[in-house]
Amino acid sequence: MFVITHRSIVFSAIALLGVFTSAAAAQEPSSTPEPSPSQPAIQSDATPGEDDDAELVLAEPDFRVLNLPSTLRLPRNGSSFQMTHRFNGNLRQGSFNENGSNLFGLDQGAAVGFEYRFGVARHLQAAVYRTAIDKTFQFYGKYDAVRQGDSAPLSVSGLVSVEGADNFQEHYAPALGIAVSRMVADRLALYATPVWVHNVAAILNTDRDTLFVGIGGRVRVSATVYLVAEVVPRVSGYSPDTAAYGFAIEKRAGGHIFQLNFNNGQGTTFGQLARGGIADSLYLGFNLARKFF
């Protein structure tokens, strides 16, 4: 049982204020040079003994795939701000000319979300995310337990979150999961993300526990351009026929990420992904992200 106060809303407001304060002071090079063949896929400007969570991983530039989490680490006291934007226009309804007259969904409003993420301690990050869908707040933690290297073939992160609708006042949905990734040189990242979500269908009061296994990948096709895709099939629980999926093209510019994506739904939290996508639907959207470390 959760005890709800206004502290959650106050905390999120302070967090968003903090990111804009950080932005005013942040200075960062506009681009990252392409590594030579002798350079490793993971690079760092840190001196020995400093927090290696700040190392640049060329195959994994962002904390999200599209909607699923990645295994990217956040250094202690570092932060990140991200905006998710999913337009309301369904590109699979109407003719090409009709969609074009609505600028392919841009004229039909959007579901917008904002996330602030902070490095609480070494290998540990916390985030607060708010999306317009059902006015949902999600509070989120990730512990990066294993990093791929000579002694480990995979990176593994533990995930925990709780989300609530109507500004975190009802329909609470806690979630537990792990994110597992495998980097292939500095060109390819593969992901498997099993997540258990409770109370997925609070309104319907049915199939309250759901397990899904998200699968994703990111391919670096040039120095700073990536192709990204994910699918989120459900293993058990809430069971509409359509699994959520999406694909995207992504551009990295220094500490900034811009991703233009297409999804068969507008959900971005664990609970929303567990409810699946929408049949015969495709929505244009984008993610914008900025790192401060």
Put a short name on every predicted segment.
Residues 2-12:
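Bacterial N-terminal signal peptides that target proteins for export
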Residues 11-21:
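Bacterial N-terminal signal peptides
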Residues 205-220:
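A contiguous pocket-lining binding segment that forms or flanks enzyme active sites
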Residues 1-2, 28:
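Short, intrinsically disordered, low-complexity terminal/loop segments
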Residues 28-167, 171-176, 181-201, 219-222, ...:
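Transmembrane beta-barrel domains of Gram-negative outer membranes and organellar outer membranes
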Residues 23-26:
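Boundary at the C-terminal end of the N-terminal hydrophobic targeting segment
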